[in-house]
Amino acid sequence: MVEFEDQLVFNSISARALKAYFTAKINEMVDELVTRKCPQKKKSQAKKPEVRIPVDLVKSSFVKKFGLCNYGGILISLINSLVENNFFTKNGKLDDTGKKELVLTDVEKRILNTVDKSSPLYIDISDVKVLAARLKRSATQFNFNGHTYHLENDKIEDLINQLVKDESIQLDEKSSIKDSMYVIPDELIDVLKTRSFRSPQVKDNIISSTRLYDYFTRVTKRDESSIYVILKDPRIASILSLETVEMGAFMYTKHSMLTNAISSEVDRYSEKFQESFYEDIAEFVEENERVDVSRVVECLTVPNITISSNAE
């Protein structure tokens, strides 16, 4: 009996010691996790309702092909799905129908005729969103309160003045201190959102002339999305191990491949580029330009001369 009681005491002491040991270890692990720079999770945001694109702003042959004429508006996700499921092979490469019916630049067509379909440079399903976006065009005008307004990049001031003259928007003299402030009604906001796929930045239906000008500048800016980009120097391809194709005096690679290669050089904890990468690109990218992936992409490439084909 005594031996049994001693065993109980021994087991009790061992349990307390074991608990203390594990508690200390767990505390050490927690401290290490707290002090380590872990990438912060982005706060989940409420999903915004998807904008419907007016049928008249979608490529007419595409609308007819898929019987979308009677739609009140076409979701971009539907366009993406139709492009992916009808213009690509089972291997995920752009098929011959897609080459004829989707909007491609002349350079893109030349590259497709040069590289093999098995090449990573060939257009594939990773390019669906770019191809789908090209099927919609920017609005050139909108109607409001019986007036027709034209959207032209070099005549934005005239547009704003005309909106004021027609009383479609009103100058708010009380709020106009450093900048002219305008009252913009909900009905006009809805029209602009429908025709340009984005809303002006307003607060309590008030918007400054600067923000309104910037808004019209953005919605009238031509879409410059590219599948292929021109590298500034052939050495960039070697540094990033990129597949390339030469067209005349220019060396092209896929925009997505270049972006992925640069993104892989970002440290997941510090969210900064690796030091070795800084050294490799120092000749092409100034130190103050190394702010993010998209900026580095701009510094390593030459602006494309876009000549569209199959557009309407």
Swiss-Prot record:
GO molecular function, one term: DNA binding
Factors inducing expression: Expressed in the late phase of the viral replicative cycle.
Keywords of the record: DNA-binding, Virion
InterPro entries: Poxvirus_I1
Compartments, record wording: Virion
A GO cellular-component term linked to this record: virion component
UniProt KW DNA-binding keyword: yes
Primary subcellular site in the record, as a coarse category: virion
Stated family: Belongs to the orthopoxvirus OPG077 family.
Function recorded in the entry: DNA-binding protein which binds to the hairpin form of the viral telomeric sequence. Required for the production of mature virions (MV).
Note: Each virion contains approximately 670 molecules of OPG077.
Protein name from the UniProt record: Telomere-binding protein OPG077
Native source species: Variola virus (isolate Human/India/Ind3/1967)
Gene: OPG077
